[in-house]
């Protein structure tokens, strides 16, 4: 698999890679000149979500000259998104050579991050990106760009107020935020909550869990486990249960055949 045109990256080290990226950004006059007229007490843009998509939105806006931006995420620092919370696959499913959130900067790609530590030979030998390693890369991305994510902050309500939006928040220094624009970068959580049948929610809580919950798989040792569904998260959790010593795992599927 061919590599990107990222010369002299191998074994460079993350500190030197950061300096290389900083030099590249300086050459592009980053960050862009602030052109937005300020309004007292108003944030220009609020981004809900400080994971991969939220961070690249921040980089895009900052590159374009917007400075008055707030990035909010309800997770604790370093645990944004699913990667080290409820995602349980061993590797990412996408090809390793996708550019991801690099926004056109070769030194900001996962490949550059990986090769700076392990070299080109290890990169060529790598099949899929390990899930936890991907989160390590995203943490480096945040730290390198100095993205001011406000962790532990939830947006509870959004209401119009004239030509602005007022956000009711919890976990912040103020109860509300007034903003011009709002970007939802909430990932899969943004499409709604888990769809759990009532007959399941009426069971004792120690007998069931949703795939997005924190699960102690060790308690499933020698147990018979039923998994409702056969999507990606269902397969991942079934594998996790078997690896933890479950005696049997059965998938309950409405379809006559496995979806392809």
Residue positions per predicted region:
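Glycine-rich dinucleotide-binding loop and its adjacent helix/turn
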Residues: 13-35, 130, 186-245, 249-251
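Short hydrophobic core segments
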Residues: 46-48, 155, 175-190, 225-228
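Glycine-rich active-site loop/strand segments that organize a redox cofactor
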Residues: 4-8, 72-135, 252-260
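Phosphate-coordination loops involved in phosphoryl transfer and adenosine-cofactor binding
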Residues: 42-44, 152, 221-223
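N-terminal Rossmann-like FAD-binding beta1-loop-alpha1 element of flavoenzymes
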Residues: 38-70, 226-244, 249
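Helical element adjacent to the flavin cofactor pocket in flavoenzyme catalytic cores
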Residues: 131-149, 155, 185-190
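A conserved short coil-to-beta-strand element within the FAD-binding core of flavoproteins
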Residues: 151-165
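Conserved Rossmann-like nucleotide-cofactor binding loop
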Residues: 53, 77, 189, 233, ...
């Amino acid at each position: 698999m061919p590599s990107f045109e990222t010369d002299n990256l191998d074994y460079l080290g993350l500190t030197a890679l950061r300096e290389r990226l900083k030099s590249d950004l300086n050459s592009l006059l980053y960050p862009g000149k602030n052109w937005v007229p300020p309004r007292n007490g108003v944030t220009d843009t609020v981004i809900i979500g400080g994971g991969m998509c939220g961070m690249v939105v921040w980089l895009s806006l900052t590159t374009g000259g917007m400075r008055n931006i707030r990035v909010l995420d309800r997770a604790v620092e370093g645990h944004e998104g699913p990667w080290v919370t409820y995602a349980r696959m061993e590797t990412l499913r996408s090809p390793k050579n996708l550019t991801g959130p690099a926004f056109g900067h070769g030194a900001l790609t996962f490949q550059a991050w990986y090769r700076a530590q392990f070299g080109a030979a290890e990169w060529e030998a790598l099949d899929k990106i390990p899930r936890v390693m991907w989160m390590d890369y995203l943490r480096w991305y945040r730290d390198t760009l100095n993205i001011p994510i406000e962790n532990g902050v939830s947006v509870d309500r959004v209401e119009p107020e004239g030509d602005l939006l007022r956000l009711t928040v919890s976990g912040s220094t103020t109860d509300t935020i007034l903003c011009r624009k709002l970007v939802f970068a909430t990932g899969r959580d943004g499409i709604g909550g888990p769809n759990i049948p009532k007959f399941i929610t009426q069971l004792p809580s120690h007998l069931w869990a949703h795939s997005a919950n924190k699960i102690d798989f060790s308690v499933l040792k020698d147990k018979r486990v039923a998994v409702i569904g056969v999507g990606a998260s269902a397969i991942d959790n079934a594998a996790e249960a078997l690896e933890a010593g479950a005696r049997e795992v059965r998938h309950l599927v409405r379809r006559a055949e496995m979806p392809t």
